[in-house]
Amino acid sequence: SPTQRYEITVELVDPPADVKNISGAAYFSIPDVICMPTPDRIAGYTPGSRYEKKFPLVPTGNNTYRGHIFLDWPIDEDYYGLGVCKWELAYVDATVARSNEFLQITRLSSAELLSLSDATAYCREEMRDKFDKTCFTPSDPARAEELGLISYLVKVKPSRTN
């Protein structure tokens, strides 16, 4: 039974009116794939070394949504008789679905989650096409100011709960 729980809070600041829903997904990987068989040694491809777990983000009022993840959702074990495979969180995505069927994604890295750091992203209010789905986290203040004129903010905040 999972025990390493983190709450994920997503806040939309001045979102567009056509936001339909928000969902979350946690992505895990096995960084050291020595524990897994490699069917194609030349390509280095190892199937099954990634795991995705979707989780709901429930509205709590004022354009704020909450959900939770567990770092120990995937189970560390010896799947193939080659040693214990250890899963690690790679990142967490918050996906905003718009009424035009376009999606916008804000990513929280495992380093941000483990250090309990917030992530703020700029998502375009007017999406050009379905490929315009990445929300940006610029480090340059001038770029952030420029994006601020055409974007709404998505703030993702992790907290440890147990």
Model regions and ranges:
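N-terminal amphipathic/basic membrane-interacting segments and domains
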Residues: 2-4
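Short edge beta-strand/loop segments characteristic of extracellular beta-sandwich folds
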Residues: 7-13
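Glycine-rich, aromatic-bearing surface loops/beta-hairpins
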Residues: 95-162
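Structured domain cores in non-transmembrane regions
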Residues: 17-113
